[in-house]
A protein has these predicted regions:
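Canonical P-loop GTPase G-domain recognition
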Residues: 149, 156-211
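A conserved segment at the C-terminal end of the G1
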Residues: 213-229
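Beta-strand/loop nucleic-acid-binding surfaces
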Residues: 63-77
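Conserved beta-strand segments of the P-loop GTPase G domain that flank and frequently precede/overlap
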Residues: 122-126, 153-155
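Short, charged beta-turn/beta-strand-edge "cap" motif at the junction between a beta-strand
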Residues: 85-90, 127-129, 209
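Helix-rich effector regions associated with P-loop NTPase G domains
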Residues: 1-20, 41-44, 77-80, 84-88, ...
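Structural detector for short beta-strands of small beta-barrel domains
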Residues: 43-54
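Short aromatic-glycine-enriched beta-strand elements
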Residues: 56-60
Length: 358
């Protein structure tokens, strides 16, 4: 005798809830964001994620939502909003679990937000003249500071003659950072990145132009949704194909951020990131006689002692000192700028308040 299971069938409301949860998970929604909202809020203000930032508009996506809305202040790709349907400009920005940023290029020293709420940063470099340990160290420090897992991805191994040398140099940067070498055009490349590209995860491809970031995103997607270009044969330099940061949802349920190449990567507010990237040098620093030791000619300098004994690589130490000095300088400059802007905004509010009283 067959049991009547009709009562066990999910209702339309249950199906809708499950579909909504699945769509949000694929966009990167998880426990960190659930903890910030009440169920009653979601009825009026559904969660949406910023997938692209344009000059005057934002592209947002959510459960059964795909819209362009007016720009908001201080938001970036990857941010989550509680969307205000009646007044999009009043949408609430949820607290970020991570934020990648840099000092904006040029003379106007501003802070530039790169991406929010990432889980993993794939730092991509070609096995050719583009390869730079110094650049990789910058990206790794930036990722560590944001509490994002950095992974070095070496591409174009099919064209390289000395792959082992590139891999060895990449692994020497930090014992805490995984190194993967692959051919970005090979369909099997996605299997090397699979452990970081699980459903609900958000990953980003960072690196110079022409290293294969968009190609890797296409490989993960299983199609050519993102335009790519070849590098110049003369110097292995890439051409800008991706002109803006855009979040793509993969068939696997992973959100992938493709970014344009960054010619300049000035660090700011990354003291902890530098400590983690250069953990061995930071540990030595604690043993110096003076807290403000410049590791040059000061007495009882633990770093100089390690250099003399051959335990420390001199070029690496010099890069570390350069990055520490750069971070201190940029952090001070941007802090002063924030104070000026805060004071300016306060004065504007005060003037408006007095005007209303009149």
């Amino acid at each position: 005798m067959l049991r009547d299971m009709s009562h066990a069938k999910p209702t339309d409301d249950t199906i809708a809830i499950l579909e909504t949860a699945s769509q949000l998970r694929n966009l990167g929604w998880g426990a960190y964001f659930w903890d910030q909202v009440e169920a009653t809020e979601l009825e009026q203000s559904p969660p949406v994620r910023i997938t692209q930032v344009h000059r005057n508009t934002l592209h947002i996506q959510g459960a059964n939502l795909d819209l362009m809305i007016p720009s908001l202040h201080d938001v970036t790709v990857g941010d989550w909003l509680l969307f205000n349907r009646e007044d999009p400009r009043s949408s609430q920005l949820l607290e970020r679990k991570s934020l990648i940023k840099r000092r904006a290029p040029g003379h106007d020293r501003k802070e530039q937000l790169i991406a929010a709420n990432l889980d993993t940063a794939f730092i991509v470099s070609s096995c050719n003249n583009d390869f730079s340990v110094a650049r990789l160290e910058r990206y790794i420090a930036m990722a560590h500071e944001a509490d994002v897992t950095p992974v070095i991805v070496l591409t174009k191994i099919d064209l390289a003659k000395n792959i082992v040398e590139f891999v060895s140099k990449a692994k020497a940067i930090s014992k805490r950072v995984a190194v993967v070498s692959l051919n970005a055009r090979d369909p099997s490349a996605s299997s090397y990145l699979f452990q970081w590209c699980q459903p609900g995860q958000t990953v980003a491809f960072l690196g110079s132009s022409g290293v294969g970031k968009s190609t890797l995103a296409n490989t993960l997607a299983g199609n050519e949704t993102i335009e790519t270009q070849e590098v110049r044969a003369s110097d292995d330099k890439g051409r800008h194909t991706t002109t803006g940061r855009q979040l793509h949802i993969m068939p696997s349920g992973c959100a992938v951020l493709d970014t344009p190449g960054m010619r300049e990567l000035q660090l700011t507010d990354v003291s902890i990131g530098l400590e983690e990237t250069f953990a061995d040098l930071h540990a030595l620093r604690q043993n110096c006689r003076f807290n403000d030791c410049a590791h040059d000619k000061e007495p009882d300098c633990a770093v100089q002692a390690a250099i003399t004994s051959g335990k420390v690589d001199v070029p690496r130490m010099q890069r570390w000192l350069k990055l520490v000095a750069e971070d201190v300088e940029n952090t001070k400059i941007l802090a002063k700028r924030r104070m000026r802007e805060k004071s300016k905004n306060k004065n504007v509010k005060s003037v408006r308040k007095h005007s209303l009283k009149k």
